[in-house]
Amino acid sequence: RIGETLFFGNNLFTGEDIEEMEQDIFRLNAEIIELTEKPVVPIGEIGENVAGEVKEFDEGNYGKTSYRAILDIGLLDIDPQNIEPLDDQIEITGASSDMIVVDLGPHKPQYRVGDLLPFKINYMGALTILSSQYIAKKVV
């Protein structure tokens, strides 16, 4: 796992960052392919997602809405647990094989369809993305 130290500046013995090294040299940019205002709590029966999980919702949010974006990247590309939105107002709320859904919050977002959302990516995420033939890579 020397790559984790070299590319992410992680001290594998202590779990801490190495101060003299950069921790964020990789970025994942995912394109917004759909943007919609939706209820925070879905109406109707809630079934299992592709991973067999049933999402739970706070009934106190019934009647509230937020903006959701669908991104052009999914579970076949990366596990959402390996990425973190750079915008701390954005929350990853779900994923399917070919898309990730993010919640942009209750206020009309500055984002539009076609915009790229940047994400921090961890070591396992970088391994997955760099190995994928379906993800364009760009060295800056």
Language-model segment annotations:
Residues 1-140:
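Active-site anion/phosphate-binding pocket segments in diverse small-molecule metabolic enzymes
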